[in-house]
Amino acid sequence: MDRYGETQDPRVTDSIPRAAVDQILQAAAALDSSDGKATFDDVRQLLRQRSSRRAPASREAMWTVARDALSDLQKLRYATIGVLPRKRSEVERLRATPCELTESGRALARLFAEKQGRARAFDELLVAWMNEHRYFRLFNRRLLLGPLYVPDVTTVKQVGSPAQASPLAERVIATCSTRLAIVGYPEAKREIFAAAVRERVAYVEAQSSLSDPDPKKWIDIIENLVVIPAFLATENLPFDAVTFQQLIRVSQDFLSASWTSSYPGFEGRVIFATCDFRPAVVNESDRVEQVVHHGKRYATTGFKQALRGGHQQLAGSQGGYVDAYALRALGCVQLSIPPAVFAHCLDEMIRAGPASGMVIYTELPFTPPPPGEAYVEIGNRRIGLIKVAAANGG
């Protein structure tokens, strides 16, 4: 049994669908619109029509998304699905594969179709994922224990060039361990991480060359085949780098977790929970029944103090303007709230003015947000700098 109360059986794996959460719900809606029954190709075509991406109008477009969405509905007992294509060459033969919603699947689809029910449909699916997708459960339970500080390697500057004589493993360990130590990552876990890095570098070097002259390709290999696998092994998370990234994306879709690369003092990603589950999942047999999101009401109590404390931490004794992305990162991680909730709470304090006990000044951004993050926006106005001052001695 691992530290999260789960039985670690190396034979037990999980398949995380490569479809977005809303696409899974759209697949259910497509089936429900035809009296609960349709074919694989019917669902594929509907998903292509509703896609915001420009998928080509071919007879195979988005077949993997349709397959993964339908497979997940079956896994969660929302549908009964026939044989689905595992590779492109099977798509034509299996177009007419029958798909039928169960009663619970039809109820989910109808909830999703209601304007006021969409959020509840997402939450119902989130609860089902927590109970049925082992990797998703492990990932979110780990976040409930505290944020994950991921020491990503994204530039040659962090580890030096391939031509350097010093051992690559030691360079990776040096840059990652230094950053992890800054955020208080336990020494014992840093030692486990270092051992895992050495093992991964040795394995990759035995399989292929790590002296590729293309810097981007070289860094991608180090990040995806060395750093992330070593970090996941240290955290006792039994999935690969691709699944890890998919779990982050799906958790954002569900509003169960978020991430930032703007956290001050740490060069890397910080991934953190943005909800709780009821009852609390203590061991493998516990089943989740309800999700409690960390919304505006949840954040209101501690937001003022978190904003003031974050500003003081960043501005120091000068008390001037600070980077809005860094301030948002501090507030979101401390309060375990999504960026959108941070923006809502900030907007309310700005509107309240001196009555809130502080005055908040803002300036437009001089730089775009880090890759993967959105602007800090209040209404239609983007904010890049923030200054917090006491009002009337408050």
Language-model-detected regions and their locations in the chain:
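Short, hydrophobic/π-rich interface segment
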Residues: 330-366
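An N-terminal amphipathic alpha-helical segment
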Residues: 298-322
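Donor-sugar nucleotide-binding helix/loop cap in glycosyltransferases
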Residues: 1-300
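C-terminal engagement modules used by replication, chromatin/transcription, nuclear envelope/ESCRT
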Residues: 263-285, 352-394
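Short amphipathic alpha-helical elements of helix-turn-helix/winged-helix folds
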Residues: 23-34, 306-314, 330
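Short glycine-rich, basic-tinged beta-strand/loop micro-motifs
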Residues: 315-337
